[in-house]
Regions:
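Long, low-complexity N-terminal extensions
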Residues: 1-183
Length: 183
């Protein structure tokens, strides 16, 4: 397969279509920053996929529960090892994503002889001061983005943009306003 690059590209394209189909029934995850902290919210009919990872890190996800659990456990272990070996202040969302989870997800996606992770992740990092919160979204192919005031995971990029556009129009300061805007 590696001798024929066009087949590899075709296989990667097929994986994208397959994974896009897997997220169509998923419940969106919304992360919004407010004056008292960060809200992660989902309206899942099943088990909510929201977790605490470390002191100032939380995780929200969409996808297959087993894949999310494996990625959550890897993040949890990585954060605690980093905090123990270095310093708790070294455990940041950016560090966990850039040097830990994103390369692993990317490798699983591009290794065509193995199953990819059926997961999208939103990592929220509570800032040391109000207004310094960060969100990182990781797609099923390992690509990630850093955002500041809010972030959304959903079935498609169009839905995410629509939800972000709605959140931009809201005046959000208190937790009550955040919950109202997120619902």
């Amino acid at each position: 397969m590696y001798e024929e690059p066009y087949r590899w590209i075709e296989t990667i394209g097929n994986r994208r279509h397959y994974l896009d189909d897997q997220f169509k029934q998923g419940s969106p995850v919304i992360g919004v920053s407010c004056d008292t902290g960060v809200l992660l919210m989902t309206m899942s009919k099943g088990t909510p996929k929201l977790y605490e990872i470390y002191d100032r890190l939380a995780l929200g996800g969409m996808g297959h529960p087993a894949d999310l659990e494996k990625l959550r456990f890897n993040l949890l272990e990585m954060a605690h090892v980093e905090g123990f070996n270095r310093s708790p202040s070294d455990v940041t969302g950016s560090r966990m994503v850039k040097y830990g989870i994103a390369p692993m997800i990317k490798q699983a996606f591009e290794e065509v002889f193995k199953a990819p992770f059926i997961a999208k992740i939103l990592l929220a990092e509570l800032g040391q001061q109000a207004g310094k919160d960060k969100f990182l979204t990781i797609n099923f192919d390992g690509t990630f983005e850093e955002k500041s005031r809010y972030a959304v995971l959903s079935a498609s990029a169009a839905i995410e943009e629509e939800m972000i556009s709605y959140l931009r129009q809201q005046s959000i300061a208190s937790l009550e306003q955040v919950v109202d805007a997120a619902v």
